[in-house]
């Protein structure tokens, strides 16, 4: 066989570089798992797995693109190769059969690929592309229809929680009671806000033709608010409150 051309040598060099990158990324993952105590964080493992996946994809694409060349090339030692001192490396280079474990992986992959090609009911590439375009939008809409933070789904609430076999019914009733209390608190706050907007300062009998009482109102001023605050009890410093909570010592009278 003739000597390989420069283009063929370039393909072999690219194959070597990709395999070296894959080997290093796998070695880095194995080393981090064996040496780290505790184990690496999930984000670190996910990052390393992503790097390995990209390296595998790069090697697979390169081997597929140059399958004809790599299948036709034959390795043989030259006269200057140190066969006595590098016998183990020479055996690996001249090995024509895969490792038994690798042969099993290759056989399973080929069987899976053949069964996928024989499946006539499988989706075509166009149908798969349409499915991937439809799935994210539909999944997002379905997620928005769900009540992820509650004890029951929206469908179970619509059908009635008394018909649900499983679930924390008592917790749900407490949740509903809490919601009612929150609504009452909001109404009270709104009522207090309205009271603050208009304050009754006097009552008198109406002088017009209608019977009844009349009310004199006024908008509260900052001065009146300060007077109300002055009428309240003394303010306890935060340090005294913390001291009382931790040691039980009563705050000093001021």
From Swiss-Prot:
Point out the coiled-coil segments of this chain. 154-190
Where is this chain's protein located in or outside the cell? Nucleus
Query: What Pfam families does the annotation carry?
Result: Med8
Any GO CC annotation of this UniProt entry: mediator complex
Q: Which UniProt keywords apply?
A: Activator, Coiled coil, Nucleus, Transcription, Transcription regulation
The main place the protein resides is nucleus
Q: Which BP terms in the Gene Ontology apply to this protein?
A: regulation of transcription by RNA polymerase II
Q: Where is the composition biased (Acidic residues)?
A: 173-199
Read off the InterPro entries from this record. Answer: Mediatior_Med8_fun/met
User: Would the keyword Zinc-finger turn up in this protein's UniProt record?
Assistant: no
Q: State its role.
A: Component of the Mediator complex, a coactivator involved in the regulated transcription of nearly all RNA polymerase II-dependent genes. Mediator functions as a bridge to convey information from gene-specific regulatory proteins to the basal RNA polymerase II transcription machinery. Mediator is recruited to promoters by direct interactions with regulatory proteins and serves as a scaffold for the assembly of a functional preinitiation complex with RNA polymerase II and the general transcription factors.
Family, per entry: Belongs to the Mediator complex subunit 8 family.
Q: Which PANTHER family match?
A: MEDIATOR OF RNA POLYMERASE II TRANSCRIPTION SUBUNIT 8
Protein name per UniProt: Mediator of RNA polymerase II transcription subunit 8
Q: What is the lineage of its organism?
A: Eukaryota, Fungi, Dikarya, Ascomycota, Pezizomycotina
